[in-house]
């Protein structure tokens, strides 16, 4: 990529109501401890060193009570004295939406300000429409694979597509999800305020010609496509992901600048629809953000077998849109020496060099906050730090705007964590427990550290690292689907069973990663989780076999406990 920034165009609901779960002999260790995406277990009255003797969960009407009175979620609450709102959120993307809903559930009078459309990048120009396009590309790819169909005994005539119909599928899905988000906030009484929000001063926000006050403020303004200097975007032949998701054309030959999540996903879409793709990558290898072993396998499957070529170790120093019958012109230079390398003439170019924070015009100068490469500096609790290194009281920043982890679900988790804090619970989010996924066919997913990162950490801290692997070729369900190409890899500590990272390439990898991410979030050790039972035959057995393949010195720390369930 030409930028270090990258983004993947990427909450569990409660179970059935009126069920009571009781346990009088809970184990003293962690497997049953509940924690949201790496939030501290202390928030749920659990202690890793004390036995749970009388913890009762009563689930009714989508409400949880854990040794405390639950806050009312029936409508927006009354604000604190002297403030218009308890919480003001600037930005109604996925992060702002998650924070708003959680705030109302906690009884906070909440307002959310949006100057564009509800849903932000993820819903309107990212995760949601891209998944619609990828759903199409996946089906096209399968129908076009005569060998794959023949293995099932199926005969399929030549597959085709209607470009506008595909584009409409993506647009309609974005509209549906956007309406769902809007309606969910309205139903809970969140005040949705229209206008561009800016901080006027401590606990004071302006939107349009209006000024409101809030006890606490969250900035959740997200990001925009990053376009390097020298690249002219016309929205037709030189485009960003914002334009590509509209699928206004399917060029015969398109260059994709950057081979991260965004570039890989669009290469999957374009090649399935008939385009030839050329990757332009600044680093010496494709897919630099992934674990090297996974990258190597993914390149063999996702790139080498398709109509894709690539240039690595080069910058696109200048890109000129097509005009007057001339093609798109791309001038390449060596990434290290900056010497001219090559010139490409293509039908279109997609700039997939990552995302840049959208933080201009937020009034940060009014509170002495200086951005760092556009990102708003925050501490581990998402509290904003001013130019003097001091915390700005009652001001938080979540999501892409703070740059900690540019993923939609990370923004939502950060927003929920902040709401927990402003309602009296100290929460620190473990970002290493947050998974990421690339929705190619097959998919790539990961959580925690890559092998090089883990070995660097081990060398500094003085412990050993081991690797466990398992292949999809040994999984019955994958073979039944004729999708045996895949690998799961775990990096761990053999001395204590700590999971440092898990990386998966294969069928439904994006779904399979969550068992590992939850284990990291909960602090569950391999010697405990390897005793879990998985249904057969399922893809989840890939992860099961991965845990079982690990060799850990420490014995399991738990024994089976009987749990009485009353329905």
UniProtKB/Swiss-Prot annotation:
Disulfide bonds join 122-127. FAD binds at residues 114-122, 131, 197, 221-223, 400, 406-409. SUPFAM superfamilies: FAD/NAD(P)-binding domain, FAD/NAD-linked reductases, dimerisation (C-terminal) domain. It is an enzyme of class 1 (oxidoreductase). It catalyses: N(6)-[(R)-dihydrolipoyl]-L-lysyl-[protein] + NAD(+) = N(6)-[(R)-lipoyl]-L-lysyl-[protein] + NADH + H(+). Disruption phenotype: Arsenate hypersensitivity. One of its GO terms (cellular component) is chloroplast envelope. Residues 1-67 form a transit peptide. It is found in: Plastid, Chloroplast stroma. The keyword Chloroplast applies. Its EC number is 1.8.1.4. The active site is at residue 536. One of its GO terms (biological process) is response to arsenic-containing substance. Homodimer. Part of the plastidial pyruvate dehydrogenase complex (PDC) containing multiple copies of three enzymatic components: pyruvate dehydrogenase (E1), dihydrolipoamide acetyltransferase (E2) and lipoamide dehydrogenase (E3). Belongs to the class-I pyridine nucleotide-disulfide oxidoreductase family. This is Dihydrolipoyl dehydrogenase 2, chloroplastic. It comes from Arabidopsis thaliana (Mouse-ear cress).
